[in-house]
Amino acid sequence: MLASEQKTIVREYRESKGLSIKEVSKGAKIPIGTLYDVEIGRRSLKDNKAKKIADFLEVPIEKLFRPTYYRAISITD
């Protein structure tokens, strides 16, 4: 691991389940490069992709990710 890389909770959960990054990439339908960048803290995801990873790992999304993208509340909400 390079000094600029950090280990994330996503990677911890993946490794604790004995899964390869390729298996999670395929199962969550997320490109392997994207998943790698997420795991080292280089990239954020929109909520739908984060949810795919959380669902595949069977972990609540809030245990893996901080909300970083927000949508304006519509008047009908």
List each language-model region with its residue ranges:
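A detector for short, charged/polar N-terminal pre-domain segments
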Residues: M1-E5, Y36, Y69-I75
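Short alpha-helical DNA-recognition segment
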Residues: G18-D37
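Residue-level detection of the helix-turn-helix DNA-binding "recognition helix"
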Residues: E15, K29, I40-R42, Y69
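Short, charged recognition helix plus adjacent turn
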Residues: Y13, D55, K63-D77
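A short, Lys/Arg-rich alpha-helix, primarily the initiator
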Residues: M1-K17
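DNA major-groove recognition helix of helix-turn-helix/homeodomain DNA-binding modules
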Residues: K29, N48-K63
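Residue-level signal for the short linker/turn that defines the boundary of a DNA-recognition helix
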Residues: T8, G18-L19, L45-N48
